[in-house]
């Protein structure tokens, strides 16, 4: 009926008003897996030699960023969070979006080609440390089309990793354990100083949360 249609329209509109528009930018880069193994907290196993930076612009106003690595815990294959930042300053210049932190500068430039990330299928979610315990947050279901990006980044720690995307998406192939490194603290700085072997790929996607 017309009334039902109107109600449905009102409900949809109401939901839309409360939704947040998210521009999400994701970049993965290669890092020696033996060194990642030495950092991971108890109970986690490294899945691939990869570190990932996710950045977001929320409602065109607020920047946010997180730093993760591919890991498995209790048969859950996904990511574990190394660090998170809110209220991240960002700038836009045409198709280029740049996020700037005291620890990191990273920019994403859309190239107008649809694409995504090969590892997304193998992702139940991400573990975040809260009150001394790692809690799994299920992966968001994002159906919007993704656009490949060129990406450039540099960690600002002494000896921090840096890289520029090669214009193609590359897989992260698991590496055998060859060198055993001493256990190190699971910190942003310890992960950020592992050299970037290459930028594996980057994309951007806009959706409502």
Model-derived regions: residue spans:
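N-terminal domain-onset segments
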Residues: 1-64, 183, 191-193, 206-209
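Interaction-surface and assembly-scaffold signal
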Residues: 90-209
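Glycine-rich, compositionally biased intrinsically disordered regions
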Residues: 33-96, 101
């Amino acid at each position: 009926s017309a009334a039902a249609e109107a109600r449905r329209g009102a409900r949809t509109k109401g939901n839309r008003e409360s939704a947040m528009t998210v521009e999400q930018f994701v970049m993965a880069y290669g890092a020696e897996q033996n060194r990642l193994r030495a950092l991971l907290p108890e109970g986690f196993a490294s899945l691939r030699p990869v570190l990932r930076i996710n950045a977001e612009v929320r409602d065109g106003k607020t920047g946010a960023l997180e730093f993760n690595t591919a890991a498995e815990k209790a048969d859950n294959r996904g990511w574990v969070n190394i660090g998170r930042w809110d209220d991240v300053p960002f700038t836009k210049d045409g198709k280029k979006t740049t996020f700037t932190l005291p620890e990191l500068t990273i920019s994403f430039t859309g190239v107008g080609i649809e694409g995504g990330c090969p590892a997304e299928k193998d992702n139940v979610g991400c573990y975040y440390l809260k009150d001394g315990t790692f809690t799994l947050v299920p992966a968001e279901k994002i159906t919007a089309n993704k656009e490949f990006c060129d990406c450039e980044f540099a960690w600002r720690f002494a000896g921090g990793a840096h890289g520029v995307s090669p214009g193609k998406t590359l897989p992260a192939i698991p590496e055998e354990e060859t060198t055993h490194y001493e256990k190190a603290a699971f910190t942003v700085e310890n992960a950020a100083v592992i050299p970037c072997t290459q930028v594996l790929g980057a994309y951007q996607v806009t959706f409502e949360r």
